[in-house]
Amino acid sequence: MAKGIMYIDGQRVPFDGEKNVLAVIRKAGIDMPTFCYYSDLSVYGACRMCMVEDEKGKIDASCSMEPKDGLRIRTNTARLKHRRMILELLLASHCRDCTTCEKNGSCTLQRLALQFGVRRVRFQDTRPHYDIDDSSPAVVRDPNKCILCG
């Protein structure tokens, strides 16, 4: 694991052993949204919510970037304003029975939609709707609530 100094939004941030740039960003106290990243699983990088821009203008998912000494990134540039649209696209194809969902009140999708000011969805739901699989006594799987995290 690498060790060094990164610059995040102009802030000098030391790192020592963090496995990706996302971990360094969070260590710096910056709230970086993610849907598909879980530290104990392999990196997928599909949700595109944790995108950052480096000093050369390259955009990449911070969860899949290794921290490097001297790396300079920005977390909130004009080119990174796509997060709101990603949320709208997820909500367009998402089952909207929030009041009966067990995650209501602690749902990351709800929290981020509120945080990014998504009040209405401009896109049509074009995905097929699936039956709920409640064949297991322990797990109920509702594929209509999938957020395509991987």
Predicted regions and their residues:
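N-terminal cofactor/phosphate-binding cores enriched in small/glycine residues
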Residues: Q11-D69, K81-H82
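Eukaryote-biased recognition of intrinsically disordered, low-complexity regulatory segments
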Residues: M1-Q11
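Fe-S ferredoxin-like electron-transfer domains
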Residues: R48-G150
